């Protein structure tokens, strides 16, 4: 089995760019950024529970990473960069720490390296469980209205929140809930030690107004690019800034 994806061929011999979206996003999430790198082959993936992969069930990160590997093989992607956001980051960081053939480098935007104690994990498990129940049983417009009131999204304007709520409400609440539980930060290992020892290029993008994740970026051995005029969702709030950073990273 493989994940649904959109593939755009590029010039032969160049590494592919593999984009992984955040929770409640889909393969369109990174398109405005990826389109600026038309010389590169690009693969925009739908993670389980989302978009064209909504019907694919998973029990945890191990299943997601197995599907990611199978998808890369099916598209004959042998040399690539992983570029992700939030949930997509956490998937790609775990995959990178475990080792994934052909990986040239890792670009993380607002990704959490993992909680560091059992109390924090227990609190997160409880919080994610409450959100999952809401996704299963309440209208998605109401759930996402509240979702985007969380402190991490404080930099969004009212118009941006409204647009995101409308967009994300097109999802399936049941499959979102299942993916949220399967890949909760509560079940993610603390990756700091392994991330600090990675032997390939590792870059971290974060919005200048995202103080929480700017602090987390300092805890891993990554080169940090601060995106001006942006918060947690930097590639949506300032896509041009993210494109500029990616161009520097990829030397394009």
Curated annotation (Swiss-Prot):
Keyword hit for Membrane: no
Entry EC no(s): 4.2.99.20
Record-linked Pfam families: Abhydrolase_6 (PF12697)
Domain of life: Bacteria
InterPro entries: AB_hydrolase_1, AB_hydrolase_fold, SHCHC_synthase_MenH
Substrates-to-products reaction catalysed: 5-enolpyruvoyl-6-hydroxy-2-succinyl-cyclohex-3-ene-1-carboxylate = (1R,6R)-6-hydroxy-2-succinyl-cyclohexa-2,4-diene-1-carboxylate + pyruvate
GO molecular function, one term: 2-succinyl-6-hydroxy-2,4-cyclohexadiene-1-carboxylate synthase activity
Keywords, in A-Z order: Lyase, Menaquinone biosynthesis
Presence of keyword Plastid: no
GO biological process: menaquinone biosynthetic process
UniProt pathway: Quinol/quinone metabolism; 1,4-dihydroxy-2-naphthoate biosynthesis; 1,4-dihydroxy-2-naphthoate from chorismate: step 3/7; Quinol/quinone metabolism; menaquinone biosynthesis
Top-level EC class as recorded in UniProt: lyase
Database matches in PANTHER family: 2-SUCCINYL-5-ENOLPYRUVYL-6-HYDROXY-3-CYCLOHEXENE-1-CARBOXYLATE SYNTHASE, PROTEIN PHYLLO, CHLOROPLASTIC
Biological function: Catalyzes a proton abstraction reaction that results in 2,5-elimination of pyruvate from 2-succinyl-5-enolpyruvyl-6-hydroxy-3-cyclohexene-1-carboxylate (SEPHCHC) and the formation of 2-succinyl-6-hydroxy-2,4-cyclohexadiene-1-carboxylate (SHCHC).
Assembly description: Monomer.
Family under the similarity heading: Belongs to the AB hydrolase superfamily. MenH family.
Protein name: 2-succinyl-6-hydroxy-2,4-cyclohexadiene-1-carboxylate synthase
Organism: Salmonella typhi
């Amino acid at each position: 089995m493989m994940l649904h994806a959109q593939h755009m061929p590029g010039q032969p011999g160049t590494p592919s760019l593999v984009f992984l979206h955040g929770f409640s996003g889909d393969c369109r999430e990174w398109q405005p950024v990826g389109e600026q790198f038309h010389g590169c082959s690009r693969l925009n993936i739908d993670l389980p529970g989302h978009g064209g992969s909504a019907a694919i069930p998973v029990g945890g990160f191990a299943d997601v990473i197995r599907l990611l590997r199978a998808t890369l093989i099916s598209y004959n992607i042998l040399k690539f960069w992983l570029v992700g956001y939030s949930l997509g980051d956490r998937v790609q960081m775990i995959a990178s720490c475990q080792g994934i053939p052909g990986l040239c480098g890792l670009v993380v935007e607002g990704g959490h390296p993992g909680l560091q104690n059992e109390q924090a994990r227990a609190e997160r498990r409880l919080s994610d469980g409450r959100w999952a129940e809401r996704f299963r049983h309440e209208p998605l417009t109401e759930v996402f209205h509240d979702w985007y009131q969380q402190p991490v999204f404080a930099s969004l304007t009212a118009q941006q929140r409204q647009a995101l709520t409308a967009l994300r409400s097109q999802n399936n609440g049941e499959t979102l809930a299942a993916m949220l539980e399967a890949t909760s930060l509560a079940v993610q290992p603390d990756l700091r030690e392994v991330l600090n020892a990675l032997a390939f290029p590792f870059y971290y993008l974060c919005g200048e107004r995202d103080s929480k994740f700017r602090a987390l970026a300092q805890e891993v051995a990554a080169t940090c690019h601060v995106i001006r005029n942006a918060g947690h969702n930097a590639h949506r709030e300032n896509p041009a800034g993210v494109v500029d950073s990616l161009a520097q990273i990829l030397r394009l």
